[in-house]
A protein has these predicted regions:
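Transmembrane alpha-helices and adjacent helix-loop boundaries
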Residues: 1-223
Length: 223
């Protein structure tokens, strides 16, 4: 049961890392768009999702969202075996993406305006400017805070136990209920969390060294 919990935790972490980076990138670009409507939508997204606890969104997508759909669809979702995992991924994604967008937006604003002018002078379109010039620099400049954010996102996977997602914390609670050996189960789960977070931080630091980025900000990631 504990190993299964670790596997589900890793699935949640990997899925939400990818989806929140993608969604956060889109929101960040919207917030710095020259189109006012896009800026307003991006800003509203961040203000709404950043100021409401992540646990709320996990509960919302598990309990409320199926009720908002046509009855047949809602019924299928409620009886879908893996919906607790799916709802957890969606809830964590929309929450984490609001923070990721803020980080990436700061990275975009830190890029000298001449970089974009140079891209325009070479004939690159707006999409190509982002793909080939701006996005690589945005991610490189913001890797330390992004890494820290992803470690926090990993720890937030434990919130999914509230909707019976069989991740590590939920598995620990079940073991305690079945065996009454809560101390041992909790200690083992703690070691798993420390080990997994340590692997994440080490991988990020190695990537930063490869890219020659100052990684001092990651020293607080486990706090």
């Amino acid at each position: 049961m504990m190993i299964t919990g670790v596997k589900i935790t890793l699935i949640l972490m990997a899925a939400t890392t990818v989806t929140s980076l993608c969604l956060g990138t889109v929101i960040a670009i919207m917030r710095i768009s020259r189109i006012k409507t896009m800026r307003v939508i991006g800003t509203l997204y961040v203000e709404i999702f950043r100021n409401i606890p992540g646990l709320f969104w996990i509960l919302f997508f598990y309990f409320v969202f199926p009720e908002l759909l046509p009855s047949e669809w809602g019924y299928k979702l409620n009886h879908y075996e893996y919906y607790p995992i799916v709802a957890g991924i969606i809830g964590l994604t929309v929450d984490n993406a609001s923070y990721v967008s803020d980080i990436l937006r700061s990275g975009r604003l830190a890029i000298p305006h001449g970089q974009r002018e140079a891209a325009i002078s070479t004939g690159l379109g707006r999409v190509q400017q982002y793909l080939h010039v701006l996005l690589p620099q945005m991610f490189r400049a913001t890797l330390p805070p992004l890494g820290t954010r992803m470690v926090h996102n990993f720890k937030n996977t434990s919130l999914c136990m509230a909707i019976t997602t069989p991740e590590l914390t939920w598995a620990t609670q079940q073991i305690e209920s079945l065996t009454f050996r809560g101390i041992e189960a909790t200690m083992i789960a703690t070691l798993f969390y420390i080990a997994l977070a340590g692997v994440m931080i080490s991988a990020i630091i190695l990537l930063e060294k490869f890219l020659k980025i100052d990684s001092t900000s990651l020293s607080k990631a486990k706090a």
